[in-house]
């Protein structure tokens, strides 16, 4: 059973959209980035939700495209001394937590995440302190400070198993920050959960009514849904899962058409694996001009070629991720707890967003 806190509607200030580059400008920045990666002993690591040209460049230069935890683990294993993380701030922090000896750069430190912004460490700590009998479980889409307050850090691929484990021990749970994912897990497990009221601005916009109408147009299509979406949307899904799990589902499901309810940045990698299938964007509640995110994270869009080139060329405090060592060590404890639990289950832990 879940206990849901009063929701506080938050309108996040979206960053301005990057100015489009000409083809000549793109070519010049790509050439410069390739040279700088070699000169700086650096590797480009990109999230599935970044623009297709960024994902393509990461793969072309021997880097990596994946979800948040996969990105951090790849950076930990790669011999490069500098990691350039094309994603949002908590992803750079996660890389620094796992690999403190390396230099972690980001195209911009202003690339935020609404889940992170909606879960300030001071307020979350205050809430946890008010419920000392609860085990604190936080989603990976959080700051290092929030992770440090947690007993467990989880990703969407292993959250069910960990919550089931805690529920079997009769432990009440505080879950943060995504209310939709928390509600999904509570309904699946029956666990006693207090849910922090955060949401992803992209997934929160998907509309069940609009999705039903689209399904009527494409009756033979499979519906793929990220569990950060509202419950009414999740109920319509043929497959529910993290970014990596949805890509896998697109490959394994027999349908030749896929309606995909997650950030449309995922289409680049998904289409690589299923070039013969038709991928269709799931509709958002705004339907066109009135949507806010329009199925693409506005902060992910900040990871452009110009910003990547500048980060590699100039570095500095505007681009480098630092995590206080005491905080890093503390946040590593719940993260390692998840990894150890997964190893015992012989699971390959995938990321979330």
UniProtKB/Swiss-Prot annotation:
GO cellular component: cytosol
Note accompanying the cofactor annotation: Binds 1 [4Fe-4S] cluster per subunit.
Gene Ontology MF annotations: 4 iron, 4 sulfur cluster binding; metal ion binding; quinolinate synthetase A activity
Subcellular location: Cytoplasm
Cofactor dependency: [4Fe-4S] cluster
Binding site for iminosuccinate: 47, 68, 139-141, 156, 226-228, 243
Any Pfam family hit: NadA
Broad class of the protein's primary localization: cytoplasm
GO biological process, one term: 'de novo' NAD biosynthetic process from L-aspartate
UniProt binding sites for [4Fe-4S] cluster: 113, 200, 297
The protein's enzyme class: transferase
Reactions the enzyme catalyzes: iminosuccinate + dihydroxyacetone phosphate = quinolinate + phosphate + 2 H2O + H(+)
Keywords annotated in UniProt: 4Fe-4S, Cytoplasm, Iron, Iron-sulfur, Metal-binding, Pyridine nucleotide biosynthesis, Transferase
The protein's annotated pathway: Cofactor biosynthesis; NAD(+) biosynthesis; quinolinate from iminoaspartate: step 1/1
Entry's EC annotation: 2.5.1.72
InterPro entries: NadA, NadA_sf, Quinolinate_synth_A_type1
Function of the molecule: Catalyzes the condensation of iminoaspartate with dihydroxyacetone phosphate to form quinolinate.
Protein family membership: Belongs to the quinolinate synthase family. Type 1 subfamily.
HAMAP family, per database record: NadA_type1 (MF_00567)
Protein name per UniProt: Quinolinate synthase
Gene that this sequence comes from: nadA
